[in-house]
């Protein structure tokens, strides 16, 4: 499993904080950030890498998280969540089988961002009654 991470200019500093944290937690990271990328481009790059392997997860950071979330939800088969708290990050994996989260550097601080990332990457899909919803999401295009 790889954690694919990317950021636009507004999210660069926080991306490095999250990236360093996850690397210290022994996760394999793939950073697709390129200089001057808009949130649309970076979200598409993260999604492309996430979709290479079923177990891959993605994190996109910009100023507010809303833009990358909107882009991610346009990608067929991508279940994404915009999060700004640890519980939502964990639960979106458990109940929605989300493969990508977005967050805003102007909304969350360093410690909260690390905890959000930790909750997301450590979350496990519960399946069962949640699968009906996940199937519905995956059929949307």
Curated annotation (Swiss-Prot):
Q: What class of enzyme is it?
A: isomerase
Among the Pfam families in the record, one is LacAB_rpiB
Q: Report the catalytic activity.
A: aldehydo-D-galactose 6-phosphate = keto-D-tagatose 6-phosphate
Q: Name one GO biological process term.
A: lactose catabolic process via tagatose-6-phosphate
What are the EC numbers?
5.3.1.26
Give the source's domain of life in one word: Bacteria
**Single Gene Ontology MF annotation:** galactose-6-phosphate isomerase activity
Per the record, the pathway is: Carbohydrate metabolism; D-galactose 6-phosphate degradation; D-tagatose 6-phosphate from D-galactose 6-phosphate: step 1/1
> What InterPro entries does this protein's entry cite?
LacA, RpiB_LacA_LacB, RpiB_LacA_LacB_sf
Q: Does the keyword RNA-binding apply?
A: no
Keywords per UniProt = Isomerase, Lactose metabolism
- Keyword Isomerase (UniProt): yes
Q: Subunit structure of this entry?
A: Heteromultimeric protein consisting of LacA and LacB.
Stated family? Belongs to the LacAB/RpiB family.
What is the protein's name according to its record?
Answer: Galactose-6-phosphate isomerase subunit LacA
Organism for this UniProt entry: Streptococcus pneumoniae serotype 2 (strain D39 / NCTC 7466)
């Amino acid at each position: 499993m790889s954690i694919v991470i990317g950021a636009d200019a507004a999210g660069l500093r926080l991306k490095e904080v999250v990236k360093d944290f996850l690397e210290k937690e022994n996760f394999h990271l793939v950073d697709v950030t390129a200089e001057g990328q808009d949130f649309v481009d970076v979200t598409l790059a993260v999604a492309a890498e996430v979709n290479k392997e079923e177990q891959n997860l993605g994190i996109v950071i910009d100023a507010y998280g809303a833009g990358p979330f909107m882009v991610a939800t346009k990608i067929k088969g991508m279940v994404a969540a915009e999060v700004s708290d640890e519980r939502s990050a964990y639960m979106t994996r458990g109940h929605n089988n989300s493969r990508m989260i977005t967050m805003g550097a102007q909304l969350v601080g360093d410690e909260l961002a690390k905890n959000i990332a930790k909750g997301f990457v450590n979350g496990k899909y519960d399946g069962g009654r949640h699968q009906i919803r996940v199937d519905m999401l995956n059929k949307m295009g």
